[in-house]
Amino acid sequence: MDIVFININSNEIDFDDYIKPLEQRWSKFINKEDQELIVHSNDHGYFNLSVDCNWKFAIENYCESYHLPTIHPELNKVSNINDHYHIQGLPNRFAGQGSKKYEQPIKGNKKFNSFPNWEKCMLKNSEYIALFPNVMIGLHVDHFYVFWLEPLSVNKTKEHMQMYYIGNDSANGEDL
């Protein structure tokens, strides 16, 4: 994922143990074999966003969908609040939401490669997890992203976004 995780608290836990519940949850979507297919996009694979908010608000916003109808009415038209479900991981590790309405983008007759072991009955599922305290991850049948938050002040945050796709053709090909 091109991210280094550091625990600065005295409650040290091995990262493999920390991430295991999320790995188990997502094993229904992607297995270890599929994880080997993830490729970072070279052209638009990394970018920053400056946000006028406290970083904790950005995490909260990412974890829930109740704000969609009022804050994101256009998004709510294609991904209605009723199509979302809540995800609660182990306390103080991760939480988020899932959707049952993901549609793969298609350009002409081409689309990004999909994870080969993703269950066919779950092709429209996507999940959005906040890995506490400041990492957010999105998992889709055809791409994966990670972004981490850098608090700049009490009301300013920089979001660092990393994009990954399945195979080099999707990540860096000319067609998409």
Predicted features along the sequence, with ranges:
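C-terminal catalytic domain of Rieske-type non-heme iron oxygenases
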Residues: 2-176
